[in-house]
C-alpha cells in the first residue's frame, strides 16, 4: 500500500453531503443503476477533482483511506465506510454481474414413477427462478451446457477461463464416472 501523504483538503460539509446522498440512494432497493448513481454522487461531491473522486471511491468501495484527513473528517470517513461499503459493493456486483447465477439449490420429488427436480436459481441481483426438470431434461441441460464449454475451449479467452476451473472440470468427470459405474 502506498504511504499516506499530505492531509487531503476537503470542505467541512463534504462528508455530510456524501452521507445524505448515499442514504437517499440506498433508501430504495438496489438495482442496475444504483452503482452509477453512486458514481455520480462521488463525482459531484468531488467537484470535478479527480484526486478527491479517487479518494472517495477507494474509501467507499475498499474501505481504505489513501490520504490523511483532519481528525473529525477521518471519523466521518470511517462512519461512512461502516455504513455504506457493503451496500456499495453489492450495487457494484449487481451492476457488473446482476444477471449471473449466484446460488442454485435443488429438491428431488418422486411423481408417477419419475424423479422430478425443483431447481431454484438465484441471480446476483436477487431475482429467483424455478426450473423444473426430470432426469431426461436434466441430462439434456447438462449436454447443452457441456457443448457450450467445448465451444468456449475453441476461443482463446474461453480456453483461459477453462484452465482457471480445471479442478471443477476434473470433479465433473469424477461425478460422471461415478454415475456410469453405478448404472453398470
UniProtKB/Swiss-Prot annotation:
- Alphabetized Pfam families for the sequence: CT_584-like
InterPro entries the UniProt entry points to: CT_584-like
Q: Which family does it belong to?
A: Belongs to the chlamydial CPn_0803/CT_584/TC_0873 family.
Q: What is this protein called?
A: Protein CPn_0803/CP_1068/CPj0803/CpB0832
Q: Which source organism?
A: Chlamydia pneumoniae (Chlamydophila pneumoniae)
